Amino acid sequence: SIAAPPVKLAMGLLIVTALGLGNAAYESGNIGGAALGLAALGMTAAAPWPALMIGIAAALLLALGNLRWLMRLLVALVMLMSLAFLVACIAVAPDLATVARGLVPRIPEDGLFTAIALIGTTIVPYNLFLHAAAARERWKPADDASDMRIETIVSIGIGALGSITILVTAAASGVGGDITNAADIARQVEPVYGPLARYAIGLGLFGAGLTSAVTAPMATGYILSELWPGGDPEQLVFRGTATLIVLIGTLVAATNADLVAVILIAQVANGVLLPLVAGLLVYLAYRSPDISRALVSGAALVWLICLLLGTRLVLRALGLWP
């Protein structure tokens, strides 16, 4: 915890700006993704109705409070989609030498923001705080540290594997062209699943979108309520923040904007905010008596180097750096 009021205020402003605004943008991508999933499943209602329905559903689920059973169902849908891409990745038989070369970091011309979006959707900033809040309730401070590390490694590994299989499948399937809707995504796995591809992708997108449409406001509410701990104010801050995030995301997704573009912009925003959140976590780790200062110093050095190099790349992409 942070006792000094000035430091707590400064960190609160950073969190409100970075995660509040960032999650509001990300929520529009969540709702847009779920709407794309419904479109793939055959729901042809015109905008803004799909987004409004999903936003209302997310708000009701947050109001009900008991989300454990729903989360398990939606996570199962997302896992099924990930499994579908894993099978498709094996079935399209990618050239292993090409896949190995792809493990070497290389950003093609005009591909920086796509790379940032990929990072932003794989390592979502608010998930770091949501995991911390969940870990505090589930694990004891010191006794279960090794189990916590194993859980983190496994969960991050599964997420990374999912991203890799999707990228490899899309690259090796031979289906080119821009992605503008769920049907374009489904074509990536049509060589394996045929006409069932649209339903597999539709269910996966809907599950992933609705899951995140609930957890993103929850995470923002948890984080901001930590600034006003104790009693009813905490509950009021949590519910008010979560409702506001859902409302903003729904209004943005309900416009006639390109949903794929909305999702991409939201992921880029997450990728840009990630260094700020990482720096905050390094600072909190530095204050912890349970973590080696030498270990934190090394992490701080890595963070600083990545921040400088990342800032340079972004400025070059914007034409502000020679």
What is each PLM-predicted segment?
Residues 9-30, 38-65, 120, 207-214:
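Helix-loop-helix module between adjacent transmembrane segments
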Residues 13-16, 41-63, 80-85, 232-251, ...:
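Transmembrane alpha-helical segments of multi-pass small-molecule transport proteins
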Residues 78-104, 115-132, 280-289, 310-321:
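Hydrophobic alpha-helical segments and their helix-loop junctions in multi-pass secondary transporters
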Residues 1-21, 40-47, 150-153, 187-198, ...:
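Transmembrane-helix boundary/entry motifs in multi-pass membrane transporters
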Residues 32-40, 55-76, 253-262, 285-289:
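Membrane-water interface regions at transmembrane-helix termini and the short interhelical loops
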Residues 9-10, 47-53, 154, 158, ...:
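Loop-to-transmembrane helix boundary motifs in multi-pass membrane proteins
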Residues 53, 62-92, 107, 269-274, ...:
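Membrane-interface loop-to-helix entry segments
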Residues 135-136, 157-184:
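Extracellular/periplasmic helix-exit of transmembrane alpha-helices
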